[in-house]
């Protein structure tokens, strides 16, 4: 099953490092919550810890919005555990509160379209899945550029706003900014203000 915006997100079950322990985790465990699933290439690398730590340090902001963060790479759970035991000053991710999925058979990365087949690693994909399991947003970066936590939060806020209010969020929308109903009349009114 391929990842397609507007369709159910590909389901998965895998081992994951959760609160310092290896456990089985399924996407369905989070039904009823929004999920931001973000892929990264490898543990013990360079841009990856900056992203993971940035998301981890702001995890409460996502939880307050009813959203679960999930980090995923093709590394094993034991590799995740070893990396989690290395201090941040030494390039590790000690103190992770975000489940780290171990996609060792590459199925999740392949299903979400981020697997670099000949290298066996994932591109930097970020997927917003709503509380009904529908994929709402896909962003995929090449390896050398990290993602923005602020933009992930903005997109999450926008999708939750549109789901709740039935209005659309224009370009560069921020929480509290003007929105409008998806109609020609409301668009004209919005554009003239």
Swiss-Prot record:
Gene3D superfamilies: Glutaredoxin. CDD domains: PRX_Typ2cys. The active site is at residue 48. GO terms for cellular component: cytosol. One of its GO terms (molecular function) is thioredoxin peroxidase activity. Its EC number is 1.11.1.24. It catalyses: a hydroperoxide + [thioredoxin]-dithiol = an alcohol + [thioredoxin]-disulfide + H2O. This is Thioredoxin peroxidase. It comes from Echinococcus granulosus.
């Amino acid at each position: 099953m391929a990842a397609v915006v507007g369709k159910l997100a590909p389901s998965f079950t895998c081992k994951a490092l959760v609160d310092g322990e290896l456990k089985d985790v399924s996407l369905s465990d989070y039904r009823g919550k929004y999920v931001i699933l973000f892929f990264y290439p490898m543990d013990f690398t360079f841009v990856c810890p900056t992203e993971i730590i940035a998301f981890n340090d702001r995890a409460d902001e996502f939880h307050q919005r009813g959203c679960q963060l999930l980090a995923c790479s093709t590394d094993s759970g034991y590799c995740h555990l070893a990396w989690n035991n290395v201090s941040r000053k030494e390039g590790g991710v000690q103190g992770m509160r975000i489940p780290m999925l171990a996609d060792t058979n590459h199925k999740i990365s392949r299903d979400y379209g981020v697997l670099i087949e000949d290298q066996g690693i994932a591109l930097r994909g970020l997927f917003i899945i709503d509380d009904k399991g529908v994929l709402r947003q896909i962003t995929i970066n090449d390896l050398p550029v990290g993602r923005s936590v602020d933009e992930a939060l903005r997109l999450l806020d926008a999708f939750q706003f549109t789901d709740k209010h039935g209005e659309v969020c224009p370009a560069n929308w921020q929480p509290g900014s003007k929105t409008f109903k998806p109609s020609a009349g409301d668009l004209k009114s919005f554009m003239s203000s």
